[in-house]
């Protein structure tokens, strides 16, 4: 949905299916390519009689695209202790680097490929980027969105949606970082050694970088930020293609936020039953009458669905919709861990984004939330580094963690995890009933829920409103499937104190 992110972890959590996770291959359109990323796919029809493997043969070779300007590199011979070392050059890391450096503090950004344009596909609500003055970083917008509950029920969402221009967003951030004096180091951090007032980052090229504060912005690797509780999240899994098609049935002025219809599976009993147990939906961004981004998505499951299963469902759906793929510009494998415990709070390494547990546990949304949190992290770092009073490394990082995860944000996340635990238990009919009620709510409620703008008192009102809008069947499902998650949430809320 909002963030389609790679994870370096192997995919043992998938239903008996191991596959290397790829991300977008940002390339010019090619008609054919030899890249194969999956074995043992089903032979359901697509493009009339074409098999799913025939669709995959249209996937082009991966070609990495880099920014075309020079970066000021970190000079290890000087042995200086930088104020902030940011590990990871994604949106979250660069946003913090940019804002901390604007205050005149020294920053080093460490990433194995600092000039590589992000391979991830980001979709956001336009109002979220407008609030951060980032409208110039959207390369396509739609006046609204559509949700297909089933063949007879459609929801029209009057909320503009946009696709992030990855190159523009990264270029804008990098240029500001360069202007502010940020230095870059092309390497992977393999270890961090902490002393009282500084930390030493050991890189895989043998270079050691010293910093007062270390920020882990590496996504879901959890390589630097520590966890002390069992990690058992739900997983959002998706497969997407940016394709040239002969035609498609969607309104080019609206994106398809969710399509829960399953009429494309009526002739495949086994696949229809699988989809009924753990449903998937179509997410689509039509750029023109013959160019469209299509993605089959499992909202959340534990364990996550196998990529082969997702692709088989997508192929059946496209065939049923009469979408004949002529060529594929980019393809994307998406695996997003959702929910699970927060990292140890506080700890010496500061985190942001996926490594700090900031993915929305009910939706998989993160990019807008993370970019909005960047000033919070940056301001905390600036405040404590600029203080006349000397702080130890542990004191400083504890203060930053407190600002990133205040009690109201932790309570909000607990409610979102409660929502995820209910969604994990819903089959297709129950999921449809849930979203039928969800998108009937006043816009301020579903807007606020999806954009992480509601806090616990408002979330309680949101929950009561959702329950009142639900059908009797859906109310019964929420009560029976949500009782244990509700008890778990209340227990966690009572234990979590300032």
From Swiss-Prot:
Q: Which residues bind NAD(+)?
A: 84-112
Q: How is the cofactor bound?
A: Binds 1 FAD per subunit non-covalently.
Question: What EC number is given for this enzyme?
Answer: 5.5.1.19
Record InterPro entries = FAD/NAD-bd_sf (IPR036188), Lycopene_cyclase_b/e (IPR010108)
Q: Which SUPFAM superfamilies match?
A: FAD/NAD(P)-binding domain
Question: Reaction catalysed?
Answer: a carotenoid psi-end group = a carotenoid beta-end derivative; all-trans-lycopene = gamma-carotene; gamma-carotene = all-trans-beta-carotene; all-trans-neurosporene = beta-zeacarotene
Report the cofactors: FAD; NADPH
Q: Please state the pathway this protein functions in, per its UniProt record.
A: Carotenoid biosynthesis; beta-carotene biosynthesis; Carotenoid biosynthesis; beta-zeacarotene biosynthesis
Q: Name one GO cellular component term.
A: chloroplast
Q: Enzyme class, one word?
A: isomerase
Mutation effect (residue 259 to A): Reduces catalytic activity 4-fold
Mark out the transit peptide. Answer: 1-79
Q: Does the keyword NAD apply?
A: yes
One Pfam family, short name: Lycopene_cycl
Annotated localization: Plastid, Chloroplast; Plastid, Chromoplast
Give residue numbers for sequence motif FLEET motif.
293-297
Assigned keywords, A-Z: Carotenoid biosynthesis, Chloroplast, Chromoplast, Flavoprotein, Isomerase, NAD, Plastid, Transit peptide
One GO biological process term: beta-carotene biosynthetic process
A GO term, aspect molecular function:
lycopene beta cyclase activity
Instruction: Outline the subunit composition.
Output: Monomer.
Q: Which PANTHER family match?
A: OS02G0190600 PROTEIN, PTHR39757
Q: Which family does it belong to?
A: Belongs to the lycopene cyclase family.
Q: What's the stated role of this polypeptide?
A: Catalyzes the double cyclization reaction which converts lycopene to beta-carotene. Catalyzes the double cyclization reaction which converts neurosporene to 7,8-dihydro-beta-carotene.
Name of this chain's protein: Lycopene beta cyclase, chloroplastic/chromoplastic
Tell me the organism.
Answer: Capsicum annuum
């Amino acid at each position: 949905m909002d963030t389609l992110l790679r994870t370096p972890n192997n995919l043992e959590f998938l239903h008996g299916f191991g596959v290397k996770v790829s991300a977008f291959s940002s390339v010019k359109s090619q008609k054919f390519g030899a890249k194969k990323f999956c074995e043992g796919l089903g032979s359901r029809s697509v493009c009339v009689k074409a098999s799913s493997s025939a669709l995959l043969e249209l996937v082009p070779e991966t070609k990495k695209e880099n920014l075309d300007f020079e970066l000021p590199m970190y000079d290890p011979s000087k042995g200086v202790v930088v104020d902030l070392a940011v590990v990871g050059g994604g949106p979250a890391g660069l946003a913090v680097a940019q804002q901390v450096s604007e205050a005149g503090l020294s920053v080093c950004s460490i990433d194995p490929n600092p000039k590589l344009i992000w391979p991830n596909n980001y979709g956001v609500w336009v109002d979220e980027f407008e609030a951060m003055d980032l409208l110039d970083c959207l390369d396509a917008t739609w006046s609204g969105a559509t949700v297909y509950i089933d063949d007879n029920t459609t929801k029209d969402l009057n909320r503009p949606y946009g696709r992030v221009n990855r190159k523009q967003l990264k270029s804008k951030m990098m240029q500001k970082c360069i202007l502010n004096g940020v230095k870059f180091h092309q390497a992977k951090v393999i270890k961090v050694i902490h002393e009282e007032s500084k930390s030493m980052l050991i890189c895989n090229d043998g270079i050691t970088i010293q910093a007062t504060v270390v920020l882990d912005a590496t996504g879901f690797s959890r390589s630097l930020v520590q966890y002390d509780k069992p990690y058992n999240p739900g997983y959002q899994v998706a497969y997407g293609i940016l394709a040239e098609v002969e035609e498609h049935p969607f309104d080019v002025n609206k994106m398809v936020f969710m399509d829960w219809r399953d009429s494309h599976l009526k002739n495949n009993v086994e696949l229809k039953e699988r989809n009924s147990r753990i449903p998937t939906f179509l997410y689509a961004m039509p750029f023109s009458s013959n160019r469209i981004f299509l993605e089959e998505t499992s909202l959340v499951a534990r364990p996550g669905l196998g990529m082969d299963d997702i692709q088989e469902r997508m192929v059946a759906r496209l065939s049923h919709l009469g979408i004949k793929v002529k060529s594929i510009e980019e393809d994307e494998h998406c695996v997003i861990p959702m929910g699970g415990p927060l990292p140890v709070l506080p700890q010496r390494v500061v985190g942001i984004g996926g490594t700090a547990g900031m993915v929305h546990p009910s939706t998989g949304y993160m990019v807008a939330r993370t970019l909005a949190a960047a000033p919070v992290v940056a301001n905390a770092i600036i405040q404590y580094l600029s203080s006349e009073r000397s702080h130890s490394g542990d004191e400083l990082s504890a203060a930053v963690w407190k600002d990133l995860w205040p009690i109201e944000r932790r309570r909000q996340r607990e409610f979102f995890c409660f929502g995820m635990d209910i969604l994990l238990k819903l089959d297709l009919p129950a999921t449809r009933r849930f979203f039928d009620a969800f998108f009937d709510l006043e816009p301020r409620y579903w807007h606020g829920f999806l954009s992480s703008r509601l806090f616990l008192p408002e979330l309680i009102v949101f929950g009561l409103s959702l329950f009142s809008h639900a059908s009797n069947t859906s109310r019964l499902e929420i009560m029976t499937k949500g009782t244990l998650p509700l008890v778990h949430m209340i227990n966690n809320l009572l234990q979590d104190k300032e």
